[in-house]
């Protein structure tokens, strides 16, 4: 039975409350000087360029997930991981937690199973098609850090 005022269901026989499970996911926008790294994901139907993202693994901190996903998806090392904000994704029961990070080292080497292309975009570069502000936290993250001349 749904419990009024709470996000849980309670068994009428034993009183056990069951709360929905969430799958935490991270998103990170990497900065290098006055440029940001944007990527186009292979599974994206929108063809937007956006920040890197991925799910946490069991036993992993969110910060460790940022470092792991960045290295796995584009072969880069980052530092100065800073919280930006979060957004619930009720379908499929996720919580997207967004960060910024600063580039340390490496050359872009995409994992072709996840990333179609990735590149640095600075203030003098034509800016790619990115998620709009109202669609997701990605749009807000990118616009807040979009390189300006």
Task: Set out the residue ranges of the language-model regions.
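Basic (Lys/Arg-enriched) interaction patch that binds polyanionic ligands
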Residues: 1, 8-13, 65-73
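The catalytic Nudix box helix
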Residues: 51-85, 99, 107
